[in-house]
A protein has these predicted regions:
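Fe-S ferredoxin-like electron-transfer domains
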Residues: 29-167
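N-terminal cofactor/phosphate-binding cores enriched in small/glycine residues
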Residues: 1-51
Length: 167
């Protein structure tokens, strides 16, 4: 991802923050590319470049995979009209791919996380979370305060503060 970015190529990314102290994790899969001679696509943010490696960033296969990833993530989001952050990075990536909504089944209402406004100084709204872990890495590795973790497994993963207590 960084080599492509340095050459002016745009590869979408969601779980990678190109800033000092942030390491790529590759878990959102929004940055998939084709590598010549390899059967499977690779997450460009975590793939180490090697001498002679030929990376295809704009093939139909890579574009299709990235588009499907974003479409699956949008299926678990509130509709843009009611989203709390209509200008989020996810929506920017969706716009760049021409996606306004997902054609996949949307998240069931009972699975949408509730707003936590129990603290006087902050509100936590996880309804737009894509479980990428960027907030965890930011707290653990950049801020070095380790106050956010992930709980659950698979599709039922969510960020938690301390012991998943209300704020």
């Amino acid at each position: 991802w960084e080599v492509a970015h340095g050459r002016g190529l745009v590869i979408p990314h969601l779980c990678h923050k190109p800033a000092p102290g942030y390491r790529p994790d590759g878990n959102c899969r929004a940055c998939m590319v084709e590598i010549e001679g390899e059967r499977v696509l690779a997450a460009s943010c975590i793939r180490e470049p090697s001498e002679g490696m030929v990376v295809v960033t704009d093939s139909a296969r890579a574009r299709g995979a990235r588009r499907m990833v974003v479409e699956m993530l949008l299926a678990d989001q509130p509709e843009r009209e009611v989203a709390h952050d209509r200008s989020s990075h996810l929506w920017d990536v969706a716009d760049a791919q021409g996606l306004q909504a997902s054609r996949l089944p949307t998240m069931e209402v009972e699975r949408i996380p509730l707003l936590d406004d129990s603290h006087v100084a902050m509100r936590v709204n996880l309804d737009a979370c894509i479980q990428c872990g960027l907030c965890v890495r930011a707290c653990r590795e950049v801020q070095v305060n380790d106050v956010i973790g992930m709980a659950g497994r698979g599709h039922d993963t969510w960020p938690v503060f301390d012991f998943d207590d209300p704020m």
